[in-house]
C-alpha cells in the first residue's frame, strides 16, 4: 500500500508544472574540418603559430566557412590532436554537442585521399588500444601509431 502511494506521488511530482525535467540529451553532429589550436582567449592562433601538444586555449575543429567548433578539454580523444600525424590531415568527427556549445568526440577519423581512417595507438606487448598518445600505461613502452582505412567509407562516419 505504501509503495503505491510513493509511486503515485513520484509520478505527480514529475508531471507537475514548474518542476524542471531532465536536460535534453545532447545533439549528435558530424563535422569535417581541420584541427585548430586556440589561444587563451579561445581564438584561433595566428597562421604560422606553432601548435604544441597542449595549447593554452585548447583545441577546436575549423569547419566550413571558418566556423570554430570548440572541443571539450575534458575529452580524452582531444589528446590525439597533439600528434602531428593526426592533426596534419583533414578530420571528421562524430560528436555530442551540448547546450553550451562544447563538443565531446564520439569518433575521430582522419580523411586521407577522400577516405576515412581510424587513428589509434597500440601496445603489441600488452594488447592495449587507446586514443591517447604516449607510453603504454602497463609496460611503459612507446605506443605504436596506426591509422587504417575504414572499409568502403568515404562519407559521414558510420
Feature map (PLM): residue ranges:
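Bacterial N-terminal signal peptides
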Residues: 8-16
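Short nucleic-acid-contacting surface segments enriched for D/E, G, S/T with interspersed K/R
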Residues: 75-92
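N-terminal export leaders
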Residues: 1-8
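OB-fold (S1/OB) nucleic-acid-binding surfaces
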Residues: 47-71
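Structural detector for short beta-strands of small beta-barrel domains
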Residues: 25-55
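Short, charged beta-turn/beta-strand-edge "cap" motif at the junction between a beta-strand
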Residues: 96-101
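Sec/Tat signal peptide C-region and signal peptidase I cleavage site
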Residues: 19-23
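Cys/His-clustered metal-coordination modules, chiefly Zn-binding fingers
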Residues: 106-158
